[in-house]
């Protein structure tokens, strides 16, 4: 890790020593102490430059400075300079990244040219100062300086440092005094001070001058001001004056480029700009390169030594030429040099040895302030002029969690800059830099536009550099003394002798041969260097163009108009208000555009763009569509459809409630460059419990997703208020009679019963009705429609009545059908309009050309949704700036930086100790679709709160072999006493949504607790309520400055490969083996040999469409040729059935976008009703998508918009149930918000009303738990009556076809189970329909119940498709949140426990007749009873098969119910997949499924023909399910990510595969199931469990507080429309499954106390009737039955005792 350690020197005295070496962990000081203002440890917000340069200068304490005897000087008085006892020689220390230490010489050239580029930038800044001084940014800088002066800003991310005015005055006065002594020929004693880097400059106006550079001030300018800055800093006036350099005498004809072009510096002084100070330029002599992580190496020392000797040799040769200067002066100076970072692109106009241009003996005493700024590098100017220039470098890295942050460029820019503006604010998501908390100024971007000439400045001086190298001999005569005395580097040795010349001459002779070898080597490297420079210059030229094309800088924005920032209040008291919106343009000018509360962000953007264009501000090559608006200073972005009213509301509620709302200030920025900003959605506040949705992932992914949604929304069909009734997809059952009766509700509460034939349509029935009423109430049958009573659906007049699902189900179950006649006008004209639009759409689809995929027989895009999804936006690649990942053959390398907050995350609790012997390590693994591709672990470090690795981990997987969609998982593990503990993990997608491998930014991610999950989420733990561990890492920069992207078109790439077109030869034996593999279930794992065989037979598999999943599992995803060929096969693969395509949504295929697209095209074959069945799994599959903007998400939303009535509610509530799940909350919020944004307004309002109602019921259910049991009913009634916010009309969440009105408080109560659910009753909107009852549950996870009920519904669908109707009663249940949900109440039903208890208490469980007698009581005629027995037989067969296959446990008689029509059904599915309950270590449930003797008795006995029919039905149903075993396995696999306790891994699904017995034929399976039937009947433990349960809950089962028996037949006939009995389906897992102590009333009716008295007589009468019937039955039974009855009585007595 690149740690930043900043040493800031304040008021350093002359006797103080300076630091000369900086390594990665500390500052090493010399012998003498120094005053350190502050030392900062590394910070995650610090952005570390890869190259830091430390320029050092010091003087020699040598008295002998007269070594040039050949010089014709008039007077040479060399005095001793005793400023500092430091013998450090002039040098430059470069702190270089290890990865950049490849070419030392290129780095030296890099440094030289970087300095000149900086000079040119500063000159340009000064020339444009008049223009910049009036800008808002410069004013902000002035305010920043004032804060520095007042010590109100801490040391962090400071970009500009200005010296004190008093020091500048003193310095200027001393310089003026020294300039008066220019004609003296004496060398003056100079008091040298700590100045900054000296910029070389010269002019040719004066030929003879004495150069005296005197500095008498001690000015230490700090790049990072600290609170310890001296208080005598006083800035009175900020004016910049130009400094002209002194002119040096030339004796040669040529001049260097530097001499031709004087450098200009900056000084802040109270003097007038016309006043000038003359200074003398100096150059840098020696350069040493140091690996900053390891200190100086031997190569460094040798290179430094050879450089010094080479320059001394050149100087000696110049001395022999006899070229003399008329004046020789020794100018001593102390330089305070700050760490700078040159760009990695070397300019071409600084070459050769241009460092010996001065004719002065310069002894330098260096005070080093090696301060590495957190943004870039900084250079401070000579003569106490300090200006920190921020630059963005090619290899620059800034901290982020998802992608690199934007950066801003301070007042200057250079062609080497990466071009991205740099934020002054250094804050990240997790850390806020200190200046952010001190001053609001730094929150705004600060980038000044450079001039066009600066950006496109061509370097035309390359050819003149070498010509100037030999023209400086005349200026080098007097430099020999300096070079001979100062060549010893401070890092190598310190000479305290006054005679350095002899030592240096000795070194020259000793290393002469080494120098020659070096020169020869340099000659050979010249060509290579020229190539490198040429390449870099080309890259620089591209970057220059990108500066403008990307919109970072403006092309000479000459417009002077600026609308200003005058604020005005927003009149929020008005419902519709208007205001002016201030928009900041990229050129930093402002425009004002009109807006209102309803104006969208997009409309403001368009107005701002038009206004900016009109005023001449926007001269960009980028189009308007590439820009978006960001909220100024808040890092917040809104979707383009967000109205301004929502923005103001968000500001008041969530940002600054106390601030008075004024003008809205937005900034026009490039959409692609948004990274730190948060995308806030404000249009679904009510849906998200009043909280805005804030996306923290890639904003471009979300914005792209919203754009696609807008296209899909245009295809949505208009929704009618009253949808058509659902048609049954199955043929009419054979059991339906030829004639049936329909009861029609007419006008004014009239009712008419009609006898209909099975071939009647709704219109023919309406015609018959009009004929019967023509004398009393005549009407036109064409102007009326039939509505299903109680359900908001109308019957299409042209369809047969038996094709309507509702009518068929009613005939089968009850035989009672209720319809309501309504006038067509009351339904509105929406129906007619809808029919007309449907006809138009059908005509357009017929005329539209259908796009084929390579073959007419392949899938056709016959849907507008798929046409939209097929428009894949391929990213635009700039070939010069991008490189394919297939060309990078290096291994994936990641640098593990550090991890912190380990203690706060309670990691020691996971380990079980906080022993110091614990060691931590990180496992870095690359996965694709859950398959491990490569892994590598880090070194072990000691356990502490903050752990630093700073280690490169080489993952043994080449970048070229990484598939698109691969993820890297980092797992933090602890080792203690040989055991490994998994502390946390996080997943990171290697290629982003644009296919870019982001290697140019460090990442900091929050860990999820536990072990690495290869198919888990790829977002970090942003929503953690506890402090999560933060881990930081970065990838290696492979091809800087180019970006690595995944190959966009692999198919085209492999098509060019001539060697890849050979077809493999497959033998017949291999084909047979392949067919056997294809028949294996989805849980079958292919071994290596089978994978190779499948891939070899890939074209044979093409003839077997079901082999697709096996083929995709056989692809070697690290081989791009195989991947490309697999994609090519997908293009021509036959279309799979929608059910088979579900397997392709498995997490093991989720990382491949192409597979996802093919699966979606197959799923589009489903009807809306089939899609509703699989909606739960499809929503769960979205969790595994690569990005939000996935084809599956768009497909589902598009299909939902096509049919809101059927799919809208299931889709929304499945999303909302998991919206608080931390791993997927962001994705599901994105989907739900996008879905509702473009959904019809009435649907949005409906969801709001439903959420409001549920919130009221949930809060009431929580409060009622604290109320005593006997007062709960009254408490519930009173609270519901007093509740004023209840919506008056809403749809039922689990069945939106039912519209309900107000709640009925007197019919609501709390149930007496542990979770205290609420029994609530609503009034139906249809006056002819009975009230609707449901159970509102809180504190229970209903997801397992929902999954089981869904699988039961799927089984019923499969059976009906095979013409097998088993009369399944599948009630509806929906989860509305975490631990909350609604359950449908099944009317006219009773639990088996209550029926048995009513037949004799505990002994009733051992009797055979209770259920049969109960059915006879409610079906008085023999015909109706036989119908009830038939329904009981079929439904019992269905549930026997279903409960056995699914392994449903906890099957006692209180979880089995029967309705009065004979339908048996199960409730409470808290245990499945073989998780049966145990007691004292023994399994209580021994039987394969529940089939007790009393059930068999109802069927007709074991020897009856009806029982044989029952057995045959069971076997048939079992074989039908077995033939679709892969569907159930796929559905369970898609549910692995839900977190259901009993469905964690594939091992749980193995139970399901075992129960299917796929190894048997249908005949063998039938025999196998027959054995299970007889085994279940003969298992006595089932009956004993029933008896024990009755005994445990006897009080509730027989008490008056519980539900009564169903009324007599006469009472049922009197109240046909009203249910005589209701049952409570309380599916609490903890109540019914885990607790046997508190289940008193979970599945029964609970009468109020007022009903006890009325029901007492009825109970006694019913008991007498039951006794009489039992007597008759006992008389008619044989001896065995009598014996059984006696045994039952004995068992009852023993149990009672």
UniProtKB/Swiss-Prot annotation:
- State the Gene Ontology BP annotations: bleb assembly; cell migration; cell motility; phosphatidylinositol 3-kinase/protein kinase B signal transduction; phosphatidylinositol-3-phosphate biosynthetic process; phosphatidylinositol-mediated signaling; regulation of chemotaxis; response to bacterium
Q: Which residues form the PI3K-RBD domain?
A: 737-823
Positions of the region 7 X 2 AA tandem repeats of K-E?
A: 1659-1672
- Where is there biased composition of kind Low complexity? 60-87, 170-196, 212-222, 312-374, 398-408, 457-503, 1609-1625
Give the keywords, sorted.
ATP-binding, Kinase, Nucleotide-binding, Repeat, Transferase
Q: Where is the C2 PI3K-type domain?
A: 888-1036
Biased segments, Polar residues type? 409-428, 444-456
Instruction: Identify the stretch(es) annotated as Activation loop.
Output: 1466-1492
| GO CC terms in record | cytoplasm; plasma membrane
The region called Catalytic loop is annotated at 1447-1455
Domain called PI3K/PI4K catalytic: residue spans: 1304-1581
> Which parts are the sequence repeats?
1622-1626, 1627-1631, 1632-1636, 1642-1646, 1647-1651
- Name the EC number(s): 2.7.1.137
Give the similarity note: Belongs to the PI3/PI4-kinase family.
Q: What is this protein called?
A: Phosphatidylinositol 3-kinase 3
Species = Dictyostelium discoideum
Q: What is the lineage of its organism?
A: Eukaryota, Amoebozoa, Evosea, Eumycetozoa, Dictyostelia
